[in-house]
């Protein structure tokens, strides 16, 4: 009896000592424990998703893929699979399972290793939310106390829902919703018992039990899950027998991107990071952009096709690599495919290896092990590239170009496969809605995988003749008209700084004598632009460009500005052209229309300032002082006259003016009115002539009329010195687009090609705006305007139409006439008299007027 008594006393003492120790340990650790009450309002890390204007997913950013689901959305069989596998006594314990701990300890004692886990689902939840993954005794103790607290705070159902959304299941998938998508491309409610069991088996070792890493291990682990479900009575013997014989059809499924717009998506990502920091990737933001699938894909296709066409006509630079030489032992298929899989794809270009070649055909293997045939049709274009201005002879047989062992690039053209190469030239396209600045499409390069540099917004490139419409607008605001006569003859002037004559030339070097300003712009006459620049003054012209949103620091104050020596981005150029298309308003480009939080609440909605040419909104710069000098035909006085230069209105005054308009007109804010609406119409009309010309001459953009088969468009070519940059920018109903093409390496120019006859409809000759950039503009605008009714140019109030003589710009007095637009009060008043043009004397040298 004494023994029993002592034993009981000892047991009680041990229990009290143990309880006291546990309590003391708890008191010691308690200050270090996080507040589990945060689980009541927990925000799971959800990736940022970017959508098109019509709700299609175009990008997703965030380290963790998670698709939150409620417990009601998860099939009961899946919940039971996790409970059977991870915590069969889940509904019986209070956070910590002594029975489970004893069972795991017993197995470990008798087997010599820990084959069963002792952590309950609640403990795993505590670990996943609050603790590090390190394996230490202190972490385990904290885990136990936290689990008990969690059980006191949350219901079993709340614990399960958090656990099933939080648990890591491999391949960046967090939660069962993401795992169902990653491995099977399904939502959780679409999963079979087989697939549920696979996912339920992942928490123990997601990196090794997943079916993408090891199918054998995945099958074995699935069968363990099924066995435990059978033991717990969650499935029948028949279900067990049938399911364990089923194959696991798993593949990696990326987020369901409807279409890709990588350059614009990256702009959105940067903007979101600037606003919200790292939480942008974790808080489940949904961002809706201004682009749509049809328009964006048309832009990407237009740019890629144009770049590939340019690259093909300049010749083939040879294989990307030689895997084995002719005469050496060929690589086996596995080695070939492993090598090709390590290479990226660029748009439509796929890496391939030539496995056989004869004069008529070559066979190439792709990364997936399939083979394609390259006939002479797909190789004929590949005459040797010698330089940007020289190409070799057209190949006569396939083996002139391809040999076995070469690593090449191929692309599919219709049903055939063609040889290709990764272009060295690059391009950008920006398209905006001129009424409100919404970005309709944006392409920053040939392929985002090739280069993440966004040429649409970051590349400052000389604009060449793309600048002329802005400068002619300045000249007309100063007093010139579309009928003003300017002399198209060569110019030569001593440049003291350079120590040589400055001799701007037309391209091509053809001169027509006295011509109207409309023709000067339509045919892109360089010397005519220089004379107009001299007439209005360089400083006035340079400052006037700021009205179109061009940064002052990028504008040179020299006569070379007339030829486009200023450097702007395609986005800036498109914004400037929008002013001419929308009636004179400077809209701000924007690309995020709405931001929602993870609950669907709208936390941002764009309210762009819009153009309103029909509104009575004054020009914020006031009326430009007209130059009497122009009427007096005295060029030099205009050029040196500083008191007549344009003076910019400070931005605070512009904002005050806009606020006054808002108060007057209501909630809608209007973009700054930077040039008067009649003047904007005149230059818009002149851009139309650049495409359609007049009887007797073509505009430099004539191909757009041929390709689009509509007359409500306008645009302007642009080519810089030595053809280092080529542009085409212009408008159509509801859209303004600018396209640039060139090399990132500023030392290279776009060069010259000769016709080979091997490429259908090949462009040849010197590269420039019309040949190198305009094809992309035409293709894109044709797609965007398909089905859009023509909208003839309609003169706004303040414009009068006068029949003028095309040779003199005066009132018509015969058959050589056309209708011309004038701002009321600037139309000619004298009848045309045909006589020889006047010259004036400048510094002792004969100098033609303007």
Regions found by a protein language model. Name each.
Residues 1-51, 89, 108-109:
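N-terminal type II signal-anchor transmembrane helix
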Residues 22, 27, 111-366, 532, ...:
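Non-catalytic, structured segments within soluble enzyme domains
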Residues 67-72, 389-399, 422-427, 450-470, ...:
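Short active-site loop at a secondary-structure junction
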Residues 78, 289, 293-296, 300-302, ...:
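A penicillin-recognizing enzyme superfamily signal
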Residues 82-83, 229, 299, 359, ...:
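Active-site SXXK
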Residues 91-101, 174-177, 236-239, 476-496, ...:
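Short, well-structured active-site flanking segments
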Residues 110-135, 186-189, 256-257, 435, ...:
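Conserved catalytic neighborhood of penicillin-recognizing serine enzymes
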Residues 500-506, 537-575:
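Mid-domain, small-residue-enriched loop/turn segments at the edges of structured enzyme/sensor domains
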